[in-house]
Amino acid sequence: MSAETLKVGIISCSGEAIPEGTISRLATRRVLELLRPDATVTLCLPLFLAGNEAERNFAKTHPTITIDGCDKQCARWGTEKHSGPVSGALVVSDLLGTAATDCRRSSRGASQVDKEAIWAVAEQIAAEVDRVLADAAPPVGAGMGTSAAQCACSSPIPGGKLAVKGVTVSIPGLPLIFEQCVERSIPADAGGSAALLDVVKIYHCILPEEEAEYRSALLAAYQDFRRGKNQEK
Amino acid sequence: MNNEANEKPVLVIPCSGIGKVHGLISREATYLVTGELAPGRTETLCLALLVKGDAEAVAAVRDHACITIDGCPKACAEKNVEMAGGRAARAIQVAEAFKEHRGAKPGNATGLTDDGWAIAREVAAAVAGEASRLRGGEEVTR
């Protein structure tokens, strides 16, 4: 692996025929956009056959994790056949079991069950990314360059800023995190601040001694966010 | 396409591209066709199964009329159907639909806006029309 492989590749199955395929795809997107935006890239699985040499070399130039909807494991099989061995392989039907029974194939009118399934899988993918990166143990400061085979989707999303102890802190995807908190009905008051902190800690490192300050700052920012949402209505 | 083939559901196969909104539109348009506009007359299958070379999937694209919906000019759905020995009776490019929607904000690869759903519905309507014609024995010129 070259220094360029510091980003983990995530290849999702397309899985059009089953809800687990949609969960696989959307959970992968969530990791790329929100959970590990600076550490991951992706590629469309069908490109291994339809694409060029750079695309087929994807798994040779990135430690790659495949996300499959079912035990046929098409993403893993296709990636390993056309691109090289994978560093990790997750199967949504194994992760969720019967929890995916009521999920839908289309994202239209997604229910709470759909959303929770996507978040659950996304968090598992993020943990797998962390494991792969730890195993790869790249040299500090090695290049974080992009590959010719990288999709445009891997650009980090805008973050939000918080003032914590007089220091401005940037948290990737904070508006989306707040959006998720609204969907989960986390209240914008002291009672909800612990849950708010727990959610943000998934995406942003917060030391135990900083938690009180972060909790206050997050609650204030969340209240502003909710006020803004209400004014839009 | 013989009469027996015309009685079979038309396979609608999207690319489901994960990098851009076009891929999501291809996927959601497929669900609109198979779930709402032409249920029973159309079906979908996992494109990844074709990539894998799954025997049932390969047989399906060889035995059924296929319509592919691709998000970008790399045309992964169309190419993978052809590599599996099938043929796309009609190959639709989502990007073409955007020409009628200058300035539209369709969303992103994770979610569609109202603009995005409108485009998906247009693509779906076109696919349903083609599927109907294919089942009637009229093969559409590409």
Task: Give residue ranges: language-model regions.
Chain B
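Iron-sulfur-associated redox domains of electron-transfer enzymes in respiratory
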Residues: 1-142
